């Protein structure tokens, strides 16, 4: 729905959602289902944000590697909203790259016994950690770094490197010295116990499903509509101004956007300023490649052990390529000081896994320093519990949603959990609802 003018714009909109990514669409669907009038403002020409998928010659390109974690807030929100995410679990088999040597990836009992990546002592340590991980107290580990946890739990150098690689894989970050061990354990548990799915059609399937859920419930979605300012009044909000001069009256506003965008829309609020100032973005560089065929079918997954590298072919698991085609994501977790060197490193890994790939290359795309998530759950700040809350102390009527908001999960789990929380608060009257404790500002 793309309304540009007319009577539809003149009435009072109870809830305005700024941002049409996963969090914004989910929040809109929840609020509209509660019977509220909802308008979503998306500055781009189509909703989706970083969950958008580009379609080229039958290939479905996500913005870098995406996997939907099962058993967490994301899957529960999708189920509540009636969104079906079709896909499949990738195999646990693959290879580990340590130095210049490929080893069998220890992804199960047999591969654990046969891999040359780990010594016997290292295999015992990794097996023991995996068996006992479910008993770890994640709350008690909130202020412990993942690096310190690894050092405490395993002793052999190769086991430490491999465990670090598993944490990088499940959290999409290489800053393990800063990452809260509590948050990391939750992610790794979910990956090991519930698994992840590569989605048919890419993540556009989630965007399509959430958009349909919102529109079916009665929400309006305005594309090409950039929110410029929120008009505030005593005790709440009055309206949202759009960059083209339009004005939408509102009782509540949900900002489902990046931290700096939230600050620009809601300036002069100390709690929000503190959250934004302390946010640490999670970055990765990604090389996405479409091939007419897979040259070495057995080498579909490679995990870097001594370097934060990732290689995975998604089309053998999910419907993201034409018949026989291969869609490969190669990534380096972390900040890239030299983007040209990183691109060459990713191409070298691709050549190692699929020698001669250039002969069957259909499309390639390099995304340097892409934002994976807007805030790393830092041990120094107390992990997940220290992230921004949906309610902003000092800004009644304005709520937050996104992967940097709320105490639940990381990545899409955080986006959708915070969307549900923000929508539930947005539909309650300010005067009648039970007052929740305001989250403390970081510091």
Task: Annotate the PLM regions.
Residues 13-40:
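N-terminal Rossmann-like FAD-binding beta1-loop-alpha1 element of flavoenzymes
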Residues 32-56:
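Glycine-rich FAD pyrophosphate-binding loop
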Residues 53, 58-89, 120-141:
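Conserved FAD-binding subdomain of flavin-dependent enzymes
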Residues 75-98, 155-164, 280-281, 296:
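A short alpha-helix-loop-beta-strand transition element characteristic
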Residues 99-102, 113-185, 193, 197:
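Rossmann-like flavin
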Residues 186-238, 242:
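Helical element adjacent to the flavin cofactor pocket in flavoenzyme catalytic cores
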Residues 228-337, 389-390, 440-441:
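Mid-domain catalytic core of redox enzymes
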Residues 314-443:
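Conserved flavin/dinucleotide-binding core of flavoenzymes
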